[in-house]
């Protein structure tokens, strides 16, 4: 179980504790055109970064959805860049030592992958983030808005997923004192696809071989946490048990206290969003960020309530349970009087909530709470008269922030048990059907009765969503070209002649509907255990170079003939000091001199291999550190991307 490092003396705490501010889903740019709520996302995002600067953290870790729009406006980009520059740049030296080559996780190698190592800018607090479902890559070049933040040197964008059906998760290795951090990230992948990828053992997690029991393994994901449907979420049982901590993005409900998974033996923390993007129950909990203090393998989470978040109160009202309103033909006046009184109570409660969030911070004289968000969900089943929701809401213009949708009237529906899910997901599925009719759903409904011959329905549906919701004008064109190229390559590979060309094309077309409509019954039951995936060690074992203290410890897999070398230390150009950068105190720059005992069962690396890895002009002797999957004994079987394709239901 995690321990509280607050009992440690200050010197040990400073030298060996990695302090990480964790947050998720700031949705910068949400509602920016709203006359009342337009600046809410900018203010809350800036508050998070200010907390990081004031609390003197070592780094910031975000769980995705920095931006609300896939193509953020100039205003949203400006506000995000401004907050990052004001709070994360400075001459304070970063005490984190990078031990791995990050080219596998952070993309473009032409620019410095980790911003605090760049000699051209002074980064005091590095920001690490994965992308979410709102700011995911799209369009020509598959760029994300986070790529813009990275190329400016303000954010370290990691956890990219170039291939959905072959995901390799490589960590960023950081060290401070004797504390070693392996930072993993999986950016957002469509939930059904990621679910199937895990079930088919197409997700690989690479681990450091040396000192493997000393690494604190932290994973960041951006997926559905709760099971809305059988496959549209990421079960915790799919995540390997070598992790110590999981930062869960995408879900907006703030569960900052976290929960311990006794089966997988890791702690899951869901920070939630920093702004309410919908008037739903999950957004009502007070918004928090947290500071994760890691010392060795122990950690302690300090939660911090956000002060600038607009208060939000939601109340559920069932009129049939209100004794003062008898069901009769003429009861509209009584209903409206009762609902108005409930809105007044909610406004008073919201103001008290805002003052509570200020804590010990003194409130500026004459400062008033921001206009609150109020939502009444009213069940008027049983013959009750109501008023037009917008007309009712307009009574509170100037008193609430959402003066057009304060109330939501609905009639209670009888839920039927689904044979497929046996009633487990009925409520959630019904809510989805009522509240969120997506373009993708319309496309799928249309294609049920109008089958396509050459294009897979799911891919076309996803392309339509990207075209409509993410303004990706080339999405449909790219989808069509990609699928046609696959079929052409398949015909070429089969060496089809002109005589049987039409027959082969018809065969391919006839096979596509069978593949796309195949019911994956084997996916409906969760596995008892999902172990680390089976991979071919010879093909998937990149090498890291490490300091001479690791020279006496070698992996038995070091003789692999197809290792890929990764520089663990920055290039000499990145080690140059700038005029503004201050040197670290000598007490903070001492290396960990503990030498591990050599295991008797470990095979030595051949002399030839050692000589190749130690021929460096650098003063420090280098050795090798391997990533590998310890449970792997057989090579995983993969589908040929050009020949076969398993499509989602």
Swiss-Prot record:
Highest taxon above the source species: Eukaryota
Impact after mutating residue 248 to R: Decreased repair of double strand breaks (DSBs)
The enzyme's E.C. designation: 3.1.-.-
Protein's name in the database: Double-strand break repair protein rad32
Bias (Acidic residues) ranges: 640-649
Species lineage: Eukaryota, Fungi, Dikarya, Ascomycota, Taphrinomycotina
Active site, UniProt feature: 134
Molecular function, one GO term: DNA end binding
Polar residues biased stretches: 586-596, 610-636
Gene (UniProt): rad32
Pfam families for this protein: Metallophos, Mre11_DNA_bind
EC supergroup of this enzyme: hydrolase
Positions of the UniProt region annotated as Disordered: 553-649
InterPro entries: Calcineurin-like_PHP_ApaH, Metallo-depent_PP-like, Mre11, Mre11_capping_dom, Mre11_DNA-bd, Mre11_N
Functional note: Core component of the MRN complex, which plays a central role in double-strand break (DSB) repair, DNA recombination, maintenance of telomere integrity and meiosis. The MRN complex is involved in the repair of DNA double-strand breaks (DSBs) via homologous recombination (HR), an error-free mechanism which primarily occurs during S and G2 phases. The complex (1) mediates the end resection of damaged DNA, which generates proper single-stranded DNA, a key initial steps in HR, and is (2) required for the recruitment of other repair factors and efficient activation of ATM and ATR upon DNA damage.
Listed NCBIfam families: mre11
Binding residue positions for Mn(2+) 1: 25, 27, 65, 252
Record text on subunit structure and interactions: Forms a multisubunit endonuclease complex, MRN, together with nbn and rad50.
Compartments, record wording: Nucleus; Chromosome, Telomere; Chromosome
GO cellular component: chromosome, telomeric repeat region; Mre11 complex; site of double-strand break
GO aspect biological process, one term: mitotic G2 DNA damage checkpoint signaling
